Amino acid sequence: MRITLVDHPLVQHKLAHLRDKRTGPKDFRELAEEVAMLMAYEAMRDLELEETTVETPIAPARVKVLSGKKLALVAILRAGLVMVEGILKLVPHARVGHIGLYRDPESLNPVQYYIKLPPDIAERRAFLLDPMLATGGSASLALSLLKERGATGVKLMAILAAPEGLERIAKDHPDTEVVVAAIDERLNDHGYIVPGLGDAGDRIYGTK
C-alpha cells in the first residue's frame, strides 16, 4: 500500500484550524473543502493528459487536456460530502457516488445502510472520500463495495488517519493508495483519532 502525505504549508495551516475546537461549523466546512481541494492536486497528479490545439487571440497553441478515464468522487456519508464539494470545484464534470455507513458504537464495526454509485463506476477513476480514517473499518468496507462493482485503482483520500486505520487498509486492500494530510498518534478507547479533530460529521453540521 502506498501512502501519500500532503504536507504542503497551506494544507497544514488549514488543518491547524480544523483541529481547533473553537472553529465553528461554517468555518470548519469551508476549511475542510479547501483542504480536500488542495489534497486533490496530489491525489490526481497521475491523471492522463493528451495534446490538442486551441486558438488563442494571437495564434494556435498546442495544449494539454485531461484524457483517459473519467472521474468519480465517492463520499462515505455523511462527512465525506464536504470533501466532494471542494474537489468538484476542480473537476466539475466528475460523477458523484454515495456510500452510507455508520459505526456500531459497541463493536465499532461499520454497517451499510445506503449505496448509490455511477452506473459506469467500473470505467471511471474513483476517489473514495472520508475525512477521518480511524479504525479503517468503514473505508475497508467501502473499498470492497466499490471493487464488487468493478472499480479498480481506487484512491482513498482522508484528511486525518490513525496508524490503526492505515494498517487495516494495508491488510485488506494492499493495492490501494491512501492520500492523507496528517497521520496522528493513535485511537482512543472509543475509536476516535488522537489528537484528531473530534467527530468530523458533528463539526461539519453542528450536531452532537
Curated annotation (Swiss-Prot):
Its EC number is 2.4.2.9. Keywords: Allosteric enzyme, Glycosyltransferase, GTP-binding, Magnesium, Nucleotide-binding, Transferase. Pathway: Pyrimidine metabolism; UMP biosynthesis via salvage pathway; UMP from uracil: step 1/1. Uracil binds at I193, G198, D199, A200. NCBIfam families: PRK00129.1, upp. Belongs to the UPRTase family. 5-phospho-alpha-D-ribose 1-diphosphate binds at R78, R103, D130, P131, M132, L133, A134, T135, G136, G137, S138, D199. It catalyses: UMP + diphosphate = 5-phospho-alpha-D-ribose 1-diphosphate + uracil. This is Uracil phosphoribosyltransferase. Catalyzes the conversion of uracil and 5-phospho-alpha-D-ribose 1-diphosphate (PRPP) to UMP and diphosphate. Its cofactor is Mg(2+).
